[in-house]
Amino acid sequence: MLCSSHNIYTAFMKLPHTNASWKPKLNVPLLLIRPSPPALRRWVPMATGPSLIPNRPCHHGDKVVVIMGATGSGKSQLSIDLATLFPSEIINSDKMQVYSGLDITTNKIPPEDRLGIPHHLIGSIGPEAGEFTPSDFRALGQSVIEDIISRGNLPFVVGGSNSFIYALLAERFNPGSDVLSGSGKVSHELVFDCCFLWVDLSFPVLDEYLRKRVDDMFNSGMFEELVQYYYDDTNRFQRGNRTGLQKAIGVPEFERCFRRYAPRKSDTWAGLDPVRRAAYQEAVREIKENTCQLAKRQIGKIMRLRDGGWDLRRLNATEAFRAAMAAEGSGKGHRWADIWEAQVLGPSAKIVKRFLEE
C-alpha cells in the first residue's frame, strides 16, 4: 500500500473497496461511526528486569480482535476490510512501524489508504527515544485498548511482531523470558477475550511475493528514503549497537554499501551509475533474503502460540495471492478480489460477527 504505481505490491494491497462504487457482498451491517482518537499519551520507557509484570486493570470480558501473520501476508488489508464492517480502531503491533520515519522501508500503511479508520501506535515513537520494548508495548497498548473500548469501538490489534502481541495479551508476562523462541511456557491465559485471525499462505507463494514486493518498494522510493536517512545523521550508520529503527530491514544491509560507496544526496534508484548500482544490488538481494527469513521466524512463533493453547483461526490466502500475482498488468484484478472475499474476508467477517454475539 506504499506506492501509486501499478505493480504487484499495489495490485494486491488495494482491494476494490477503495472504489466508492464498490460495496461488500457480505451479510454484515456496515457501521462507519469514526470518532477521532484522543491524543497519544507521552511514552515513558519501562524497566525490563526479570520480574513478572501483572496485567493492567482491564476487564477480562473486553473483546479484542487480533490479526496475525507473517510479513506481507495481507494483515493490513484484512484489517481495513473488516474495519469497514465493524465500528473499530486499529492498533499497530509491528515493532518497526511504531517508530516515526522510514515509512516505505518499514511498510507503513499510508494515511490515504486507512480510509479514515483511526490507527494507533504507528509512527508514534521518535527513533531518538531508543528501544521500544515489548514491556513498553504492553503498558501503552493496553491503555489504548481501554480508550478504544470506552468509545464503544472494537480494538483490532494488527501486526507481525508476535513478541509484542504476546506481551500485550498474556495474563502474566515475564520480560526476561523469550517464550516464543523456546525458553519458557506459553501462557494461554489472556488479559482480554480475544478473537485471533491468522492470515497464512503457502511459503513458496509468500516467498515469491515478498521478493517482488522489495523490488516494488525500491521502485517507489525506498532507496531515496534510505539515502535521506543516511544524510540526516551519518553517525547512526557507524554505531555498533543498533536500537529501534536502526534494526529495520534495509538499514543494516545498506550500511555496508554506504560505507564503501557513500551515496550522493541527489542519487536516485533509477539514475545510479553502474558501479554503485552493482554494489547496491547486493544489498537488495540481502534485503530479500532477510525478509523471507523474517517471515519464516514469524510463522514459527505463531505456531508456538497455537501449540501453547492460543485459539488461532487460520485463513488461507494462498489462492488470492496466486491470482494477484497472475493478474499483474493483465487488468484481471477482479478475480483475485473475489477469491480474497470468498476465502479470507468473508470467513473472517463471519468469525468476528459470531465472536461479538457470544
Question: PLM ranges: what are they?
Answer:
Residues 2-87, 192-358:
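Catalytic core of IPPT-family isopentenyl/dimethylallyl transferases
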Residues 48-65, 76-156, 164-182:
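N-terminal phosphate/diphosphate-binding loop that engages ATP/GTP or pyrophosphate donors
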Residues 94, 122, 160, 221, ...:
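Residue-level signal for inorganic ion chemistry
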Residues 111-116, 185-191, 305-307:
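Short, conserved catalytic or adaptor-binding loops enriched in Gly and charged residues
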Residues 132, 136-139, 159, 163, ...:
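Charged, alpha-helix-enriched surfaces in structured cytosolic catalytic cores
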Residues 147-224, 228:
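Phosphate/Mg2+-binding loops and adjacent switch elements
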